[in-house]
Amino acid sequence: MLTATGIRAVIGKGGMDQATLDAMKQYGCVYLAIVGGCSAVYTPAAKLVDDYWPELMPVDNQRLKFELNEFGPLFVAMDANGNSVYAQCIDNAQKNRPAIYQTLGIKE
């Protein structure tokens, strides 16, 4: 998709897999994460321009094109250097889990 469209930024709320992160690094694309609970802020700033493949259901499989005006707040969750805050969070949780379990008296 990145090579066919030339997309430089994707907006979402949950990240993408490692293969997509690798492709984003290769083509200089970033993943911008929306902040949960801000739909009242985001909605007025987005105007639907096109609906690609509207027959695809569920809606999360559709590809929509929006015109954005003063759209935010956003943060770079996956960058064009191959870094991912999602992967970092998982790594930190796994690294700290033994100590947390020990503190709470939970056996692994």
Predicted regions and their residues:
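Feature captures the catalytic cores and cofactor-binding loops of soluble hydro-lyases/lyases
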Residues: 1-71
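C-terminal binding/interaction regions
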Residues: 44-108
